[in-house]
């Protein structure tokens, strides 16, 4: 059952990433049709913009991300238990030892970053280290190490980049169509019915694509959280430890320092004040759902 869940989550992520690329091509084609009467040119432009965004974000410095989140690098002498747990989990996962950081914050949280296992890092709050027992801390670190091993940071970064690219292209397309004085619209009024249909479809694509992109990006983030939970259990062989850790995380207070959207998606638990929004608009699945899945393993 455990490995079936892992495989299912991986398949869902592939499907969502494919949907993202389709969405990017559609928004590019719509903009190209409205502005240059060329689907191909618009789609190619959209893919280039998406690739530039993805590469620039993937290679963002690990130290920069840690600095933005007030994390300080430690050695084995600073927090030996925490350091050795990270070391043990990395060994079991068969990845290089990540750099280890601590965030001085009373909330219960942790995250991993790095575009590959070779330049990865793990951070945990002082609150987490104080409250979690060894089994629970192993489960949390197993979750973060699984993100590294599964290249989740890279996948999530690509999703954020593609969502940003879709929003940018939609904004550019909308502004240029407005400033062009409606030449495309005038042409389509004199065209056949198909041209009018394509005009409406293109305009709707520009309007709705950013929302759709955000929903897909958030869905990918949630799937990777489910996958990391299951992968942590595969590493520790202790689903109860993961369940107890999640139960404690559910009672955590928000982080005391501001956390930006990109960083928030990295944490094991939503680091900001939890708003009563639909699960569709959350970077993290409800902890109750995560626990329920673990109980059925």
Curated annotation (Swiss-Prot):
Membrane topology: Multi-pass membrane protein
The record's free-text note on cofactor binding: Binds 1 zinc ion per subunit.
Record flagged with keyword Cell inner membrane: no
Cellular compartments per GO CC: plasma membrane
Enzyme Commission number, as recorded: 3.4.24.-
Subcellular location: Cell membrane
Active-site residues, Swiss-Prot/TrEMBL: 144
Keywords, alphabetical: Cell membrane, Hydrolase, Membrane, Metal-binding, Metalloprotease, Protease, Transmembrane, Transmembrane helix, Zinc
GO BP, sorted A to Z: proteolysis
Similarity section: Belongs to the peptidase M48B family.
Protein name: Protease HtpX homolog
Organism per entry: Streptococcus equi subsp. equi (strain 4047)
């Amino acid at each position: 059952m455990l490995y079936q869940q892992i495989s299912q989550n991986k398949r869902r992520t592939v499907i969502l990433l494919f949907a993202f690329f389709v969405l990017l091509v559609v928004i590019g084609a719509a903009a190209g049709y409205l502005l240059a009467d060329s689907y191909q040119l618009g789609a190619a432009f959209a893919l280039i913009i998406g690739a530039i965004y993805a590469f620039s974000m993937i290679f963002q410095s690990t130290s920069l991300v840690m600095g933005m989140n007030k994390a300080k690098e430690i050695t084995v002498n600073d927090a030996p238990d925490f350091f050795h747990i990270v070391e043990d989990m990395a060994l079991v996962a068969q990845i290089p030892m990540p750099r280890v950081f601590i965030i001085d914050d009373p909330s219960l949280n942790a995250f991993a970053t790095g575009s590959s296992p070779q330049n990865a890092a793990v951070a945990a709050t002082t609150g987490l280290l104080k409250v979690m027992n060894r089994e629970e801390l192993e489960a949390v670190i197993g979750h973060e190490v699984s993100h590294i091993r599964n290249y989740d940071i890279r996948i999530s970064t690509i999703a954020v980049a593609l969502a940003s690219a879709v929003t940018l292209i939609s904004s550019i397309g909308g502004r240029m169509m407005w400033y062009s004085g409606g030449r495309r619209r005038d042409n389509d009024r004199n065209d056949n019915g198909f041209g009018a249909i394509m005009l409406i479809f293109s305009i709707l694509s520009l309007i709705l694509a950013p929302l759709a992109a955000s929903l897909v990006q958030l869905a990918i983030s949630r799937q990777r959280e489910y996958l990391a939970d299951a992968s942590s259990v595969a590493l520790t062989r202790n689903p109860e430890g993961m369940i107890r850790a999640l139960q404690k995380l559910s009672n955590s207070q928000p982080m005391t320092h501001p956390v930006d959207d990109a960083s928030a998606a990295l944490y094991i638990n939503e680091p900001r004040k939890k708003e009563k929004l639909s699960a569709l608009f959350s970077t993290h699945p409800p902890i109750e759902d995560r626990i329920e899945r673990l109980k059925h393993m």
